Every structure is written in C-alpha cells, then in structure tokens.
Amino acid sequence: MKSSIFFKLLLLVSLLVVIFRQSYAVADYCNRDADCKRVCLRPYACNLTRHLCMCHPNDVSSSKQHCIPEHKGFGEGGPPPQRLKLYR
C-alpha cells in the first residue's frame, strides 16, 4: 500500500516538473515584445495569448562567424574541403 502511494506521488512530482520546465525553461517564453529580442531577429513580437515569441529564430549558425573565437585559426576560413572519392 505504501509503495502505491509513493509511486503515485513520484508520478505527480514528475508531471509537475515536466510542466514547469515546459512553461519556464523555454527560451521563447515572453510577456512583452522586448523579451523576444534575445532569441529573435527583427521583426519579432510576443503572442500574448500563448506567451510565445513569433519571429525568425536568432540562429547562431546563420551568423558570419562559424567558429569559436578562442580556437586556433579563428577567422582564417579553415582548410579547403576534401574531394570525395568516386567508386565505380
């Protein structure tokens, strides 16, 4: 009997953690347009009904810098791509 109550309590706590993380850990959660500035490119707006940013994502890979500044060879363009070998 005790294990059944413990199991139900564990499921309830797990469910609450999942709901909390979905609501507050999501980067595009917003209460006003200014909250979307850090995760979006212009134009951006906050959907106040759903509290989600409506925008083009501010994707790191779309920036001109495709490498980490601290790494050796940053900004040199990197080595040329290797040719693929074709097998017949």
Curated annotation (Swiss-Prot):
Transport in keyword set: no
GO cellular component assignments: extracellular region
Record's subcellular location: Secreted
UniProt KW keywords: Antimicrobial, Disulfide bond, Fungicide, Plant defense, Secreted, Signal
Any single biological process term in GO: defense response to fungus
Signal peptide: 1-25
Family of the protein in this entry: Belongs to the DEFL family.
Name of the protein in its database record: Putative defensin-like protein 256
Organism: Arabidopsis thaliana
Organism lineage string: Eukaryota, Viridiplantae, Streptophyta, Embryophyta, Tracheophyta
